[in-house]
A protein has these predicted regions:
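Acidic/polar-rich alpha-helix caps and helix-coil junctions
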Residues: 1-123, 146-303
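Extended substrate-binding grooves/exosites of carbohydrate-active enzymes
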Residues: 131, 140
Length: 305
């Protein structure tokens, strides 16, 4: 909590923001500093590093699943970090919320499609779809292979045991899929349920077209054409009462967040002080730990950050 609050205090939102220059508490004291203070990034970085060191000493670490030859399986790693508990080997959740997540709780109900008695209300907006990297670890507008025109001609097969793309292990997208959804990073497929993606519980592809089985104009359909997939068991079929509806933890904080917060704070301070050479290796270490787990190429320099 301390590291998160110090990161907030260092951010331009409240660090020297003229919008809050006269914002005072009941005692008449300024709540936020009226002039920008780069040293707040140092305090944030120190708090994040302390949190990392203490967490790792206590046995916390990034959740990673490996394939048969010991290599990282980014699909299963980024999927199960949101599903598995401490007792199942997940040592990443530093601040869990042990609240029920049964079908009639709003999240799971809203993330299910209409034909299977779901509300279809947990939609994903296009901006988030666009924010995920391509398979090469690049923003979509920086990857010349990215296209929003036409449909794929081939099946995208990768080295993973994940089978929730087409219903077959290792197949991420089938032929005939809108190219916007092709050749994206693993976290995209774990997080977003898009059109023509395999629905394990329904044993068919999703149909988010207007007047489709999962689409509008019904109010029980996502108007963006996407549903959230993260933390939802793809086998869930509320209509038949099948699939996995067991309670799952929520995560107020994961070790991955602290890694990125530490890198951000150290990077921002380096911008002010011109200490890229001294801090580059440390910054990239923690950013690349996240990228490696996600199955995308590492950053080689700070020019990308």
């Amino acid at each position: 909590v301390r590291s998160r609050m110090l990161l907030f205090a260092a951010s331009p939102l409240v660090n020297g923001n003229e919008w809050y220059k006269d914002y005072r508490n009941k005692a008449g004291e300024l709540v936020f500093n009226p002039t920008y203070d780069p040293n707040k990034w140092v305090k944030a970085a120190e708090a994040c590093k302390l949190c990392i060191d203490e967490a790792e000493k206590a046995g916390y670490k990034l959740y990673v699943e490996t394939g048969p030859t010991g290599e990282n399986d980014p699909f299963m790693s980024t999927y199960n970090v949101h599903i598995k508990k401490w007792s199942e080997g997940n040592r990443e959740i530093t601040f869990p919320v042990t609240k029920g997540n049964g079908y009639f709780d709003f999240f799971l109900y809203g993330a299910s499609t209409r034909e299977f008695s779901g509300g279809g209300g947990q939609g994903v907006y296009q901006g988030l779809v666009d924010a995920f990297f391509t398979r090469r670890g690049l923003p979509i507008l920086e990857d010349e292979s990215y296209s929003e025109k036409g449909f794929s001609e081939n099946v995208d097969k990768r080295n993973t045991s994940w089978s929730y793309g087409t219903g077959k292990e290792g197949e991420i997208t089938a032929a005939g899929i809108y190219k916007m959804y092709c050749n994206r990073e693993p976290r995209f497929y774990i997080s977003v349920l898009h059109n023509e993606q395999w629905h394990i519980g329904g044993k068919r592809n999703t149909d988010f077209y207007m007047d489709g089985k999962d689409g509008g104009p019904s109010h029980d359909a996502p108007w963006s054409g996407y549903l959230v997939r993260k933390r939802v068991d793809p086998s869930a079929n509320p209509k038949e009462g099948s699939g996995d509806y067991k309670n799952r933890h929520g995560a107020l904080c994961r070790l991955a967040e602290i890694y990125l917060s530490y890198a951000e704070a150290l990077n921002e301070y380096s911008i002010e002080k011109g200490t890229y050479t001294a801090n580059q290796k440390e910054i990239l270490k923690y950013v690349n730990l996240i990228r490696e787990r996600a199955g995308i190429p590492e950053y080689l320099s700070l020019i990308h950050i």
